[in-house]
Amino acid sequence: MMPLRSSLSMHILPSPRSPLLTPSLPSHQRIYLAPMEGLLDHSLRDVITRVGGIDVCVSEFIRVTDQLLPKRVFTRVVPELLNGSCTAAGVPVRAQLLGSDPHCLADNAARLAELQPAGIDLNFGCPAPTVNRHRGGAVLLDEPDLVHAIVAAVRRAVPAQIPVSAKMRLGNRDDLLMLANAHAIASAGASELVVHARTKLHGYRPPAYWDQIARIRQAVQLPVVANGEVWTVDDAVQCLAQSGCDTLMLGRGIVADPALALAIRGLLTPSWQALLPLIEHFWQRIASHVSPRHRAGRLKQWLNLMRRRFPQAQVAFDLVRTTNEPGMVQTLLFGAPPLHP
């Protein structure tokens, strides 16, 4: 069986996207890469920012409980902190904290600030049941006063030149406290607010309620970034129109199509064949920090999402669907012995 590079490059299908598009986002506006626990780690951030079109990344969350974390915890989750808080492509990375204790979050933010992050983001949006049961993420949206206390404490704890932003959903079980939470975040001194246009109960089920972001944007005096269910250029157009925002945050959509930010900007986008070296680069990167038993799963997770956009990703996924052995994945997809045992 021919490896990925050979077999797929022989079957490159015409791209359904025009190579040059009318920009959906003014050139002076920005596109952010979302934090996604278990998916968008530093390896995938590296790949996606190499493709281009991203202005700012936000890391997956760093869980803060009742302890002052050592700096190595921050740099393990956000190794870009050792590179001027930027990816290899030079894109700034903000580090995200998640917790419910204002004092402990402030203490950890102060320590994180010693590593000079491009910014500190606060997570009020994670819908994961495990996180919510431990009073973290979107469940905090039931307590706007606590949300305010957290943002205010972190803002006081870090130097003024380090931005403190927040990411929230429309609410926990419903959106009744949506504006109260937005006001809590704004009045506490946040520099920016990202809004995922669904509640915690909505999870990731479509649709996203972009029009609700417009209500938030009209109610607060700080920049608001729209997030949620943007998979295509048309989605981006609709999101911008309905939310009234001029800045987008992309999550699963750009994992499925790493060139989505370029397409939204109306720039030339790479073919599947041009993405193949980046897929191999990702595989080599995860070999350095993901255990062998989970390594194939990480690659299949990405290929599974890419199947939405690229027929060739379906071929690649099928090649490795039944194996979790890194050496076999290496041989099937890249046609060379594994670089790591």
Residue ranges and their predicted role:
Residues M36-G38, I62-V64, L98-S100, G125-P127, ...:
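Active-site beta-loop-alpha junctions enriched in small/polar residues
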Residues R72, R135-L141, R265-L268:
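Short glycine-enriched, charge-decorated loop/helix-capping segments at active-site entrances
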Residues H11-I12, R17-L21, M36-R111:
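Glycine-rich, positively charged N-terminal anion/phosphate-binding segment
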Residues E60, N123, H196, G244, ...:
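Conserved residues at the C-terminal ends of beta-strands
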Residues A109-I120, F124-T130, H134, L146-L222:
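Alpha/beta enzyme core
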Residues I54-D55, A118, S191, D246:
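Short acidic/polar active-site loop segments enriched in Thr and Asp
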Residues P3-Y32, E37, S43, R156-P159, ...:
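Alpha/beta catalytic cores of nucleotide-metabolism and tRNA/nucleoside-modifying enzymes
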Residues C57-V58, Q96, D121, V194, ...:
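Conserved beta-strand positions in the central sheet of alpha/beta enzyme cores
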